[in-house]
Amino acid sequence: MNKIYKILILVILFSCNSKNILTDTGEDSGGGFTGEVGYIQDLNVELISVYDSQTASFSAPFGNFVRNFIVHVPPDYNSENQSLPLVFVLHGYTSQAPIIRQYSGFDQISNEENFIVVYVQGTTDIYGNTGWNAGSFGAFTTVDDVGFFRSLIKYFKTVYNINEKKIFSTGMSMGGFMSYRLACEVDDINSIGSVTGSMGRYTPCQPQTKKSIIHFHGEEDTIVPYNGGDWLYSANEAHEFWKNYNECGNQVSITLPDLNGDGQYTKKLTSYNCEDSKIVELYSLEGEGHTWYSKNWGHDVSSSELIWKFFEDQQ
């Protein structure tokens, strides 16, 4: 199958709830999404650009903002006979969706493990910095990010063939905070992963369903302190919250091998025997700061691979 034909198929796969599809060149190609449009009538998605035969970017007006996201599907994705997991990946404060796409490596994991990954772009504050209404940051309180993700999930359920029991979110820093908020407020989210992001003390969290949580945090993080503060939970407090909420019966802590030989270790705390087969994990990285952890960059663990393995194991 030649590349042009693959791209043509991609455009069809990435069709949207509007009367026109915008192609890579911006030309009007006609057509449009022909399925159950009523389910996505609150989110009018337009194709912006086709990157390659597996990846494209989209925009959708929502509230007072135009929202953007990048979708990557695995090779040979066929919506007619494949029901795949869906993973949202959220950037940190001041960052961008293309940046976390580059450093997290989820495209490659998606190709190998067969799931759909979506890199969502936050909105901007008055200083032009991107971020999320994670409930703890005043600059974004007017943005209905929770509502947007609910609509985005509805869109993917309708346009793509999604395994509705396997919808996940992960993020870096403020993207981790936002993933925690989605765990608290969006029932469709099965589990979340956070890298250097925690929970706000003054953000209500009353989930209606049990959620599995995996959290990575450097003990020397000076941006989002490992030990928390007046307005945010420590990494251990966030773990304790979900351990209690999930009614976990057992807990074990192990020290992982010092793979890079720097004399500093990663401790893995696991709460298990929880209700609904949920699990809560905390990786505490001795001597590490505010970053996305990867063995390729000299860390003892690789966040992305462990997050996906954790998601894959969830029921």
Task: Identify the meaning behind each predicted range.
Residues 16-86, 112, 141, 170-193, ...:
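A domain-start/cap signature at the N-terminus of enzymes
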Residues 65-73, 77, 82-168, 178-181, ...:
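Serine-hydrolase catalytic machinery in alpha/beta-hydrolase-like enzymes
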Residues 222-234:
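Conserved alpha/beta-hydrolase "acid-adjacent" motif
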Residues 215-217, 221:
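Short beta-strand/loop motif that positions the catalytic acidic residue
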Residues 231-263:
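Acidic, glycine-rich loop-and-strand cores that form catalytic or ligand-binding grooves
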